[in-house]
Curated annotation (Swiss-Prot):
The gene is nifW. GO terms for biological process: nitrogen fixation. It comes from the Bacteria. It holds the Pfam family NifW. Belongs to the NifW family. InterPro entries: NifW. It comes from Rhodopseudomonas palustris (strain BisB18). Homotrimer; associates with NifD. May protect the nitrogenase Fe-Mo protein from oxidative damage. HAMAP family: NifW (MF_00529). This is Nitrogenase-stabilizing/protective protein NifW. The keyword Amino-acid biosynthesis does not apply. The keyword Disulfide bond does not apply.
Length: 115
């Protein structure tokens, strides 16, 4: 499904509008990013989490609204593309998925403590 090429953001703060978005589809529509519903059905939370990771070091509030909107769009496209070529299991953006492949810690119990 392809959203319009122009974002559907209303006049005002892009960050506030994205905070009010109720679904991943709304993020894509607001920012004017095309998406495949099949990909979004499987990886919606992963894509949005990755978008947040990419934006974590940026101060969107300090940017002019048009620049912030363009930056959000570019980052959402980048996050979405991450999941076009790999799966959420490959990307492991959530802690539970990272922990699943982390080496298991062995616990050492000294023999003296077993008396």
């Amino acid at each position: 499904m392809c959203s319009p090429t122009q974002p559907t953001l209303a006049a005002g703060n892009v960050v506030d509008q994205l905070k009010r978005a109720g679904s991943a589809e709304e993020f894509f529509t607001l920012l004017g990013v095309c998406f495949d519903p099949k990909v979004l059905d499987v990886a919606r939370l992963h894509i949005l989490k990755r978008m947040g990771q990419y934006l974590a070091s940026e101060d969107l509030e300090a940017m002019p609204n048009s620049v912030a909107a363009a930056r959000c769009k570019a980052v959402l496209e980048r996050a979405y593309e991450d999941f076009l070529t790999s799966t959420p299991l490959d990307q492991r953006v959530f802690k539970v998925l990272k922990d699943a492949v982390a080496p298991k810690k062995t616990h050492f119990v000294p023999l003296e403590t077993l008396k």
